UniProtKB/Swiss-Prot annotation:
BP GO annotations: response to hydroperoxide
Superkingdom of the organism of origin: Bacteria
HAMAP family the record matches: UPF0246
Organism ancestry: Bacteria, Pseudomonadati, Pseudomonadota, Gammaproteobacteria, Pseudomonadales
GO cellular component: cytosol
Family indicated by similarity: Belongs to the UPF0246 family.
Name by which UniProt lists this protein: UPF0246 protein PP_1289
Organism: Pseudomonas putida (strain ATCC 47054 / DSM 6125 / CFBP 8728 / NCIMB 11950 / KT2440)
């Protein structure tokens, strides 16, 4: 089983990585093509394109300018440790063991607007480029057109490498839309996390994002390999709802959100 998650806007390049092991992103030719195009944009154009403040636009213009195809631990950091945010708070990669990182490397992928698909130990230089960005390019009107069926093909290869065909989708709609289902040779398992509010179970974004990270951690640490085993997930009060679930759409409920 292969798990996919979204990246994060928040990055941490200050905290030293907890592992010295690293790999290099596999699709840097694609990334470099995007970088070359992004370098042609002024900070004002970046601000308008990405809906960023002038300060953030300037920061990311500088990031695009300093990006280099030569990745080292001095200018980059392992993706799973560089990303922060709600999903990554739940995943808590800093406390994973070396064996956990080894398992994650084969069974977890992060979708990315710039890198396409990242493995946990792939070095990543800092960037901001959300998948939904309407960056017109030689392949079409946006990043979905740029990546086309490539991400699906790479996921197919990763699944083939582990001899499986189950893809666990813990990514947002924005990012999973970059996976072209028609080109994907996999059974996709979707998951919803619902918290009780005013007597009803609802998807609450902050809690759901954190839960996606917690389930990713659960899969890594428990070496989960089948959808059936996912039903055992019970972190921070969540429990599997057989009533609300379908074979390829699992639903987990929580009565009292943990603070």
């Amino acid at each position: 089983m292969l798990t996919v998650i979204s990246p994060a806007k928040t990055l941490d390049y200050d905290t030293p990585p907890v592992t010295e092991r690293f790999t290099l992103p596999q699709y840097l030719d694609e990334s470099q093509a995007l970088i070359q195009q992004l370098r042609e944009l002024s900070p004002a154009q970046i601000s308008e394109l990405m809906h960023l403040s002038d300060k953030l636009a300037g920061l990311n213009a500088a990031r695009f300018g300093s990006w280099t195809p030569d990745f080292t631990p001095a200018n980059a950091k392992q993706a799973l440790l560089a990303f922060k945010g709600d999903v990554y708070t739940g995943l808590d990669a800093e406390s994973l063991s070396e064996d956990d990182f080894s398992y994650a490397q084969g069974h977890l992928r992060m979708l990315s607007g710039l890198y396409g698909l990242l493995r946990p130990l792939d070095l990543m230089q800092p960037y901001r480029l959300e998948m939904g960005t309407k960056l017109a390019n030689a392949r079409g009107k946006d990043l979905y057109a740029f990546w086309g069926t490539r991400i699906s093909e790479w996921l197919n290869q990763a699944l083939a490498d582990q001899g499986d065909d189950v893809l666990l989708n813990l990514a947002s709609n924005e990012y999973f839309s970059a996976v072209k289902r028609s080109a994907l040779k996999a059974r996709v398992i979707n998951v919803d996390f619902k918290d009780q509010k005013n007597g009803q179970y609802k998807i609450i974004s902050f809690y759901a994002k954190k839960a996606r990270g917690m389930m990713s951690r659960f899969v890594i640490q428990q070496r989960i390999s089948t959808p059936e085993q996912l039903k055992q997930f019970d972190a921070q009060g969540y429990y599997y709802s057989a009533e609300q679930s379908k074979p390829d759409h699992l639903v987990f409920l929580r009565d009292h959100p943990a603070e």
